[in-house]
């Protein structure tokens, strides 16, 4: 364990290496338990076969955490079920390749690619954590990731509002600044209030995660889901309203609002869709 930490963490933390997380598959998006990628023992190696899609950083990453099926067992009701494990895969491992880069609507500066495993052989000590507990590891990773995406959404919304406030002060129609019109003022006020509400949810989730990192036996799945759900929706709504206040200029690339609007949408999709966040929240309520 410590040898792996010494090998990977310094380079990842310094930025010399970039990492990526491989969970999503062509047939396993929201249904993350529907994994098809497999890892089979072969002497001192694991042999991986399958593919992953929509993997952030994949085009440039040096090391990947990959979730793959290692065991098939019967659950308490006698139904067949899959157990997944987590593995460390290096870019240079035989049988591993990075597929096509996605041509995305937004976050175009972020590399998003397919991962392909064709009899990819990795040393046995590259299993991460406990065998059969990869799904739990993935879900814990997503809890933290959702706070990060909520923060991203919050930043997009705040940036869009700042750009819009500056624009409406300068833009003149009917002989005066459009910031003088009540409609503009009410739009700005509502956007500001919604952003601040989202901010408190994001900070509350981050605080709960910090408590867990400091040793407290607390979970933050619901807080992370709430923060992501509201912050992502806020980002999409705020950028749409901001573009409307920009008018035709907002629809051009002379101003950043159109990019912010495109970037906002992905926050409602990755690290779990908004619908998944509602499943997490309602599941806790009805438990």
What are the functions of these language-model segments?
Residues 27-30, 54-57, 77-79, 104-111:
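Short Gly/Pro-enriched turn/cap motifs at secondary-structure boundaries
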Residues 4, 11, 15, 29-32, ...:
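Alpha-helical interface subdomain recognition
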Residues 34, 92-121:
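Flexible, small-/acidic-enriched active-site or ligand-binding loops
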Residues 40, 66-70, 88-91, 116-118, ...:
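Short beta-strand-to-turn element immediately C-terminal to the catalytic PLP-Schiff-base lysine
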Residues 15-23:
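A short, Trp-centered hydrophobic/proline-enriched beta-strand micro-motif
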Residues 49-98:
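A short core secondary-structure module
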Residues 36-38:
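Beta-sandwich/jelly-roll carbohydrate-recognition scaffolds of carbohydrate-active enzymes
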């Amino acid at each position: 364990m410590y040898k792996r930490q010494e090998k990977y963490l310094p380079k990842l933390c310094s930025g010399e290496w970039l990492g990526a997380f491989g969970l999503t598959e062509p047939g396993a998006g929201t249904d993350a338990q529907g994994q098809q990628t497999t890892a089979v023992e072969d002497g001192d190696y694991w042999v991986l076969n399958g593919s992953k899609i929509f993997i952030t950083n994949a085009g440039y990453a040096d090391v990947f955490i990959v979730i793959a099926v290692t065991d098939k067992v019967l659950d308490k009701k006698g139904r067949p079920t899959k157990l997944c494990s987590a593995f460390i895969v290096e870019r240079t491992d035989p049988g591993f390749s990075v597929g096509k880069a996605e041509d995305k609507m937004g976050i175009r500066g972020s590399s998003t690619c397919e991962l392909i495993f064709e009899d990819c052989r990795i040393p046995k000590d590259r299993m991460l954590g406990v065998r059969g507990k990869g799904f739990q590891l993935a879900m814990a990773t997503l809890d933290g990731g959702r706070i990060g995406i909520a923060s991203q959404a919050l930043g997009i919304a705040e940036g869009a509002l700042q750009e819009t406030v500056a624009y409406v002060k300068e833009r003149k129609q009917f002989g005066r600044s459009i910031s003088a019109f009540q409609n503009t003022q009410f739009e700005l006020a509502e956007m500001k209030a919604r952003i601040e509400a989202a901010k408190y949810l994001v900070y509350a989730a981050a605080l709960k995660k910090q408590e867990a990192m400091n040793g407290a036996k607390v979970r933050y799945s619901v807080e992370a889901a709430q923060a992501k759900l509201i912050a992502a929706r806020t980002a999409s709504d705020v950028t749409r309203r901001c573009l409307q206040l920009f008018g035709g200029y907002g629809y051009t690339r002379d101003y950043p609002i159109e990019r912010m609007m495109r970037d906002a949408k992905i926050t409602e999709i990755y690290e779990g869709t908004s619908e998944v966040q509602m499943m997490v929240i309602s599941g806790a309520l009805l438990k």
